[in-house]
Amino acid sequence: MAKYMISGSKGGSKKPYVPKEMEDNLISINKIKVLLAVSDGECDPDFTLRDLYLDDVPVIASDGTVNYEGVTAEYRPGTQTQDYIQGFTDTSSEVTVARDITGDNPYVISVTNKNLSAVRIKILMPVGIKTEDNGDLVGVRVEYAVDMAIDGGSYSEVMRDVIDGKTRSGYDRSRRIDLPKFDERVLIRVKRLTPDSTSSKVTDKIKLQSYAEVVDAKFRYPLTGLVFVEFDSELFPTQIPNISIKKKWKIINVPSNYDPISREYHGSWDGTFKKAWSNNPAWVLYDLVTNQRYGLDQRELGIQIDKWSLYEAGVYCDQKVPDGKGGTEPRYLCDVVIQNQVEAYQLIRDICSIFRGMSFWNGESLSIVIDKPRDPSYVFTNENVINGDFQYTTASEKSMYTQCNVTFDDEQNMYQQDVEGVFDTEAALRFGYNPTSITAIGCTRRSEANRRGRWVLKTNLRSTTVNFATGLEGMIPSIGDVIAIADNFQSSNLTLNLSGRVMEVSGLQVFVPFKVDARPGDFIIINKPDGKPVKRTISKVSADGKTIELNIGFGFDVKPDTVFAIDRTDLALQQYVVTTISKGDDENEFTYSITAVEYDPNKYDEIDYGVNIDDRPTSIVQPDVMAAPENVKISSYSRVVQGVSVETMVVSWDKVPYASLYEMQWRKGDGNWLNTPQTANKEIEVEGIYSGNYQVRVRSVSASGNASPWSKIATATLTGKVGEPGAPINLTASDNEVFGIRVKWGMPEGSGDTAYIELHQSPDGTVENSSLLTLIPYPQYEYWHSTLPAGQVVWYRIRSVDRIGNVSSWTDFVRGMASDDVESVLGDILDKIFDTEAGQEIKENAIDSANKIKDQAQSIIQNALANDADVKWTRVQNGKRKAEYGHALELIANETEARVTQIEELRASIDGEITSSIKTVQEAIATESETRATQIQQLDSKFTKEIDGVRKDTSASISDVRQTITNESEARAQAVQQLDAKFTKEINDLDGVIKTEVEANISEVKQAIANETEARVQADQALTARFGDVESALVEKLDSWASVDSVGAKYAMKLGLTYKGQQYSAGMVMQLSQGSSGLISQILFDANRFAIMTSSTGGTFTLPFVVENNQVFINSLLVKNGSITNAMIGNVIQSNNFVQNQQGWRLDKNGIFENYGSTPGEGATKFTNEGLKVKDANGVLRVEVGRITGSW
């Protein structure tokens, strides 16, 4: 039997699958709609969802990743005509439909109402469940779409949506379909895209529950930037997210030549603007000031702002500087949101602080200055500052900050506030740790925050303030301008002369009145007439320091007394920024006080580029003891000058620290030490030396005047010129020059090393009586010796002295004489007379002088009588007879003056031809610039009568004016009186009108003047009488003055006639004055006859002195010294000790000359036309020549 293996397994129970049901996840969701007003005014139109941030996360990232689904947004740039945002807010009318939407049965909504803005559909899914094969209950997915056909056109899809999830209780959602513009109708078709389910396991029907016809409110909000954001509430279930937008914002006015994207300025700006986006702080400021919606000009006052200074600031802000990461960036940007109302002044200051600016009102407009590199606009020195006084104030060390913590909005961290610390190590070593903090307005870059902090530290460390007062030059600089200050007190404690006023500028040479401590390579700065300083390089300075030569001329006319300053290579001018300018009060209205703060021109490269530049010192600190020069060397060289070999000694030495000048002394053999002019060089040349042994020593001098000990004496034997200098040749002295002698000479060949000519004078041509007259610089070849009396004789001799003190031999004496030619002397005196005021006075005829005085008096009277006061009249009339009284009283007090005027006038007349009047005017005026008091009295009478063709007019008047005037610079008092009497007769006959005029006039003008430059008193009086064509005048003029450049007195009395068309004159003028022409003391007479008369007790007159028709007659004359060109003897000429036949001498008109000597009884001599006779002491005739008579 076969065996079978039976096998099997143990049976058991398997746990059955339990179906699962997912939770309902289709829940009706609300839409979040947010409308943000993001800007007042037009903004840049570009906007995408990449610019929109929800809780600091962009809706769409820069790489295109969508961070938030279902977010929509609309943007309006804030234009005047912008469209409204659809869907916010609206009114609607809902229509119930409750129709299933299947793939074969879409639903069409017809819209014909053109006022509708949109149609809002509501889709309902009553149940959305799917049963899986394993019994699980899950959600369904149904996709649907909305098509639109416009005015009979074809359908196009406008929206596609999907419902994905599970719901048992039903789920609905609303979707807005915006309507376009149409003419007739719009068809909206709602269709199902997911095929309809045929399985009982799937329940996914959808239906159009209803639709609403929507009319938007259509609020455009013109000129307001808008952002509308819409998203499902499920994205942020707990709270509304923080919504922010990062984009270009405001469109503002920018220059027409400006590209805000590349930040470049093309060509020159014509002052016009265009609209564009910009975050340049200068143009942001311009918008804030000029905008009439939200800016400073909301009242539409037309606020003026200096756009040219803003242009300068804008260009500076856009310049590229290192960004600290290897690239570049604009220097300053303004990324700021102004959300609240703020004070305008504070806002302007905050915006200006972005670009280191300062705002001020310049009298016409709001002006902006920025702290940037700039040249000084004017130079102030001790010369053009009142009292030469600069007052300095230095801040406390506590305010010297060494660390600055800058708070800014970091763009790399979603504009969260951060702090950038800036530390100055060098300052901390000096002042310690001293922090400060600032908030950087509009700053979003860490690199810019660092620059702002560095600027705070560098600027604050230069905190010295200067105050000074000046004259009208204070009107030249403006707030924010850089000025240069040359203060000899501050720079060198008066040890250096580095500023002053020029005497003259000629070509490349500048002449100054004192020694200037300038050197070649230094700079001289001069203020141009328009105020702008001009700098030129110095090529050479004369030995006396008074002549400066330039490399290049100034190119404009430099007036004398123009201020200059020296900018040395080792000592810079101080520079300051003007912060305030204030005008003086009434007493000092032409003075200006200026306050300025220290300016550092080197800080900008350190702030922007981190470059440290060593500053030149503005003051010098020198050692008390100077070192002596070392390595003193002596050498020589020769050169040929005009065929003559000239040897030159050269002395050199090493430079000494802190030395500004050097002094050298030398001597030949054992002679005296000779000085050379101080020099800033390390070498001196002595030209024209002679052969011999020379010794030299040198010492250094500091700028403060400290001198070192002399160096060791250096010795050398040099081969130079042999012998002595050549003596001058051809010495002459004139004898035909009036009141002087002209001395001339020549020089021999080889005299090029001559330094000067030594001129001696002698009254008699002897060495014993000679004396030094003067030293004449070579190569001058003549000398004018004046003033000498006519006929004076002087003897002269000269010798030459070379540059190193060697002297030539003396020339022989030559004789010179001041001319004794009377005709030449009188001609010269006459020319000098007419060059003086007295000469011009006596030259003018008295009638012309009288007319000038008369016209001056009438002008003063008429000007004083001019008055527009309203005179009230009282009149009484009886027929042709009229009596009138006028009176005016006027009182005025207003913003510019106080004035009181009183006028009183009395008139009496008959038929208008016989009149008499008295007028009195009194007036007192006080204004801000002048006071004036005037008193006038005028008496006037007129009589006119005509009988039988003969008309006679007579008039008489007296005018009297008293006036005082004072103002800030002058006081004046005037007294004018004029008496006038006239008679006119006219006869009408067949031949015409015969007119005769007779007039007598006295005019007197007196005035006293005192002002800043002179005091003067004048009294002029003129008496004139005229009958027809015949006229006479008497004039008396008194004048006394004292001024800054002259002092003197003058008196004139003149007579004048006009007779038969010819003028005649007589007069006298006296003048005594001292001025630029020297002392003038003279009395001048104009007369055909000038006589001095004496009278006796019996009434007899004699004439001791008479000038008649150009001849002088003298009755008796005693002359000590006299010179006669031609003389005639009318009787005899004899010595004053003459005694007939005893002593003295005598020459008579018959030609007999007798000479008895000075002692009686010593013999005698007698000359006649017939012979010569001599007798001895006993009276015996001893000699007889010619005709022999044998008797005396």
Curated annotation (Swiss-Prot):
Where on the tree of life does the source sit, at the highest rank? Viruses
InterPro entries named among the record's database cross-references:
FN3_dom (IPR003961), FN3_sf (IPR036116), GpJ_CSF (IPR015406), GpJ_HDII-ins2 (IPR055385), Ig-like_fold (IPR013783), J_dom (IPR032876), Viral_Tip_Attach_Protein (IPR053171)
Supply the alphabetized keyword list: Host cytoplasm, Host-virus interaction, Late protein, Repeat, Ubl conjugation, Viral attachment to host cell, Viral attachment to host entry receptor, Viral genome ejection through host cell envelope, Viral long flexible tail ejection system, Viral penetration into host cytoplasm, Viral release from host cell, Viral tail assembly, Viral tail protein, Virion, Virus entry into host cell
Q: Where in the cell is it found?
A: Virion; Host cytoplasm
Question: Coiled coil located at which positions?
Answer: none
Processing and modification events after translation: Ubiquitinated by the Bil antiviral defense system; about 20% of CTF is ubiqutinated when the Bil system is expressed in E.coli MG1655 and infected with this virus, or when this protein is expressed in a strain with the Bil system.
Residues annotated as signal peptide: none
* Keyword Lipid metabolism listed: no
Report domain Fibronectin type-III positions: 628-722, 727-821
Q: What does this protein do?
A: Attaches the virion to the host receptor, inducing viral DNA ejection. During tail assembly, initiates distal tail tip assembly. During virus entry in host cell, strongly binds to host receptor in an irreversible attachment. The binding induces structural changes in the tail leading to viral DNA injection.
Subunit arrangement? Homotrimer.
> Which family does the record claim for this protein?
Belongs to the Caudoviricetes tip attachment protein J family.
What is the name attached to this protein's record?
A: Tip attachment protein J
Biological source species: Escherichia phage SECphi27
Q: What's the source species' lineage? A: Viruses, Duplodnaviria, Heunggongvirae, Uroviricota, Caudoviricetes
